[in-house]
């Protein structure tokens, strides 16, 4: 609470300093610099508000777009790791291969199904999908490693499972991400000042000015809606796509179809 009061105090101090500079400066500046009315001050304020709003929007959009790209990159990393585990399981005995590949498919389907809905509605990960991933890790860790080749295959699969878990952890953080509150405060403050600009500018109310103001409001509203949509990487109308997992599922089918050929007909 003390921090908030201090910040408000700093803002008030700047307001006092600005007014002080303005009043004192008016007394010392040449009379030729003065205007006959305060229209110049109004235009200056509107220009500053416009610039402030544009700067805040640009800053917020850059932050959110980078977060969106990062969230998508995490899904790609997870999808690649899933394919790696599935493919590596081909070099394991038949019973272990079937169990591991089945768990990989189940986990991937849970992510694009129930877990995606949970992230959309609750901004968190699904415990059921986490349980499946834990079962997958246990299955890989318990696979027999009778010789050096089998041990190498198991280690490779465990490394890929670790990559899945890491990408999943990052995705969980992405699902719960929100823009810092102070940026929303600054954004809404700039929006209110911008909307009141029509009052401060002294524009006459006519059909044309009403139409232009309405269009202006639509543009401002569209910007605000877009920002809120970007602030939810895995929910809303502009969420991160499932393409990495859907591609992984397609890859699983391809690997399964080629498995007998790749193994040369040898039993696993």
Show the residue positions of the predicted features.
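Structured inter-helical modules in multipass membrane proteins
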Residues: 71-72, 77, 83-176
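Short extracytoplasmic
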Residues: 51, 57, 84-102, 252-266
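Membrane-embedded hydrophobic alpha-helical segments
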Residues: 41-62
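Transmembrane signal-anchor/signal-peptide helices with a preference for the extracytoplasmic
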Residues: 55-76, 231
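Juxtamembrane/interfacial segments around transmembrane helices
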Residues: 62, 94-112, 235-247, 263-268
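Alpha-helical transmembrane anchor segments
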Residues: 2-32, 173-268
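N-terminal positive-inside, membrane-proximal cytosolic segments immediately preceding the first
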Residues: 24-46
